[in-house]
Amino acid sequence: MYDINEDEITEEWEVCAMNDNHKQISRVPMPKTNRAFHTLFVDIIVMTQAITGEQYALHAVCPVIKFHALAAVDSKAVIPDMKAMIQQIEQTLKTHIEVIHTDGESSLNGLAFRNWCRDRHTLLHITVPDTPEQNGPSERAGGLITKRARHKIQGANLPVVLWPFAMKASIFTIN
């Protein structure tokens, strides 16, 4: 009655099976610390080009005391800004950051930065690329800051190109 081709059925079944696959995420718990600035979570947020030329926001958060730091940068070459941010946090708050936790961002895990971390006895923990679930505190904090900055811009009826100022104001009110 029906003319069925086995190749077509097999292909449809493969498509159905592929659609039902779930993303497997490592659920290894992150080590908890009680000391502020023991671990600093870092992420790069891609934005639209700002009025001052920046296109990326380098964001760092301490999950223990929920302290945020941000630098607006014009390229993904953020190592000098990252070093300056870490040194400013350590000098201002008289502490030593022991672990820097980043996602697999290529601009944050280069050899020069790894050597800098090793020389200052700081562990650089890099998660798998394109897996934001493994960098949870930084991703959540980045989403919060982006949301608050967007509300500030829309509430004041300002152009979107002023996002660096809105993000810095959001961090100021959060801290």
Language model segments and positions:
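Retroviral integrase
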Residues: 2-147
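Charged alpha-helix within mobile-element recombinases
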Residues: 138-175
